[in-house]
Amino acid sequence: MTKEMQTLALVPQGSLEAYIRAANAYPMLTAEEERELAERLHYQGDLDAAKQLILSHLRFVAHIARNYSGYGLPQADLIQEGNIGLMKAVRRFNPEVGVRLVSFAVHWIKAEIHEYVLRNWRIVKVATTKAQRKLFFNLRKTKQRLGWFNQDEVELVARELGVTSKDVREMESRMAAQDMTFDPTPDDEARDGQSMAPVLYLQDKSSDFAEGIEEDNWESNAADKLAYALEGLDERSQHIIRARWLDDDNKSTLQELADQYGVSAERVRQLEKNAMKKLKMAIEA
């Protein structure tokens, strides 16, 4: 697939509202039109046919991505990841199977979004507000010396960092939460059927996955490992992670960072993905 088509399909440019309006403006295909385009791609390698198939299904990706709101992840990034899944589905779609592309593509779209959420939610939910980010980068040093805080220590830390006692307690709890596997485990099934596996939460708007993790409150040193791993990244990767997830409330978009570094948005996405992979490996080590 051409670079131009990848840019158009993968990276929502400008405002999200404008992107969604543009996606909805592309006409939906009839079954006959879809099959003709799919045959041109499948048998002739027609990239223009692939482009038309992708553009006509962008609205579907945006609709699916909305079901994964509530994780502190940018909606544009969720759509971008879903679009990657759509492109994979289009590349693998066989018109002779006898199903519509939308039915075939839904698995690929959701799989990419699932992977993205699970790769990033932990880092986002540890520090989602400015006060929590301040705590995240300072609290671990105090905890290494004192361990779990009593109430007097909580109040002391709160005064020193200029936050509330509630903020300190919440961050202490978040820093103790450990990561989860995607699918239910035998241990989950043994706990009165109350599984915390993300596969049961990701697309359920009535459930707050992060809140469930915090309530379960499994102790872990994941936050310490994350902070140390951040220090081990190169300067550009550190800046990308902080600008995208950990800095001020106005998080940078892929395009903004691309303009800053003089590279493509796709290149920034690759750097971000590699940095996230290193952080995840450090957390799981």
Curated annotation (Swiss-Prot):
Q: Could you tell me the superkingdom of the organism this chain comes from?
A: Bacteria
Q: What does this protein do?
A: Sigma factors are initiation factors that promote the attachment of RNA polymerase to specific initiation sites and are then released. This sigma factor is involved in regulation of expression of heat shock genes.
Q: How does it assemble?
A: Interacts with the RNA polymerase core enzyme.
Keywords in alphabetical order, please: Cytoplasm, DNA-binding, Sigma factor, Stress response, Transcription, Transcription regulation
Name listed for the protein in its UniProt record? RNA polymerase sigma factor RpoH
- Swiss-Prot/TrEMBL GO biological process terms: DNA-templated transcription initiation; response to heat
The entry's DNA-binding region feature spans 254-273
Sequence segments annotated as region (Sigma-70 factor domain-2): 53-122
- Tell me which PANTHER family the record gives: RNA POLYMERASE SIGMA FACTOR RPOH, SIGMA FACTOR RPOH HEAT SHOCK RELATED
Question: Where is the protein situated, by its record's location annotation?
Answer: Cytoplasm
Q: What is the lineage of its organism?
A: Bacteria, Pseudomonadati, Pseudomonadota, Gammaproteobacteria, Enterobacterales
Q: Where is motif Interaction with polymerase core subunit RpoC found?
A: 77-80
Specify the species.
Answer: Serratia marcescens
Instruction: State the GO CC annotations.
Output: cytoplasm
Record-linked InterPro entries: RNA_pol_sigma-70_dom, RNA_pol_sigma70, RNA_pol_sigma70_r1_2, RNA_pol_sigma70_r2, RNA_pol_sigma70_r4, RNA_pol_sigma_r2, RNA_pol_sigma_r3/r4-like, RNA_pol_sigma_RpoH_proteobac
Q: Which family does it belong to?
A: Belongs to the sigma-70 factor family. RpoH subfamily.
* Alphabetized GO MF terms: DNA binding; sigma factor activity
Pfam families named in the record: Sigma70_r1_2 (PF00140), Sigma70_r2 (PF04542), Sigma70_r4 (PF04545)
Stretches for region Sigma-70 factor domain-4? 229-281
Coiled-coil portions: none
Q: List the disulfide bonds.
A: none
